[in-house]
Regions:
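Domain-level signature for proteins that mediate thiol-based redox and metal-cofactor handling
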Residues: 1-203
């Protein structure tokens, strides 16, 4: 098993399991293999909402080739949690490990970056449609800021115009609980079709 020490690595910002790769790796990290690494990781699903990928949710921020002081190259996989302390991050790191190993890519390491903080603005339009089809109302509104711009941290508030029901489209909905199946969702009920649903909180 071969490990890779990233240049200027900050151990507090890297998930613990990662600088490792299976011995059967055939494709080293290079500019030529970078597109394959992206393609591999774009298919990794979110463990809590498997209908969307970590790229579509904006969790996967970057994949790049880095070189250490010994001249060795590796893939650096940059991820940002949806919120600090998100319990799914360890599972995401393990799923990334499995995907890279299956694809025969490496060595690699996962780097967790907390700034800029993740925002629901990073969820792609395709992911929003997939969430709706899955029965989860996507976040409404937008912060209208770039990923690198300073952003105020805001807490969840109820949308003024109601959350459209992902089942029937009605905006005549009500909050059942500010806490849904996961910490990033609220639980709603539609008054029109009477169906319950989760709403992905905007922040």
């Amino acid at each position: 098993m071969h490990s890779f020490a990233a240049p200027d690595a900050d151990p507090t910002m890297n998930l613990p399991l990662t600088p490792a790769v299976a011995p059967e790796v055939l494709t080293p990290a290079s500019a030529a293999s970078l597109p394959l690494a992206w393609q591999t990781l774009e298919a990794v699903p979110d463990p809590e909402i498997p209908v969307v990928s970590i790229r579509e949710l904006g969790i996967l921020r970057d994949v790049r080739v880095v070189t250490n002081d010994r001249g060795e190259t590796a893939f650096e996989i940059v991820i940002t949690p949806t919120y600090s302390g998100c319990p799914a991050m360890q599972q995401i790191a393990e799923d990334i490990a499995a995907a890279m190993t299956r694809a025969g890519l490496g060595p690699w390491h996962v780097k967790t970056v907390l700034a800029p903080a993740w925002t629901t603005d990073w969820i792609s339009p395709e992911a929003r449609e997939k969430l709706r089809s899955y029965g989860i109302a996507p976040p409404t509104g937008a912060h209208a800021v770039s990923a690198d711009a300073p952003r105020k941290i805001t807490f969840y508030g109820r949308p003024k115009d109601g959350v459209p029901c992902p089942h029937c489209g009605s905006a005549d909905t009500e909050v059942v609980s500010a806490f849904g199946s996961t910490a990033c969702k609220a639980h709603y009920r539609c008054r029109t079709c009477s169906e319950p649903f989760d709403y992905f909180k905007p922040y």
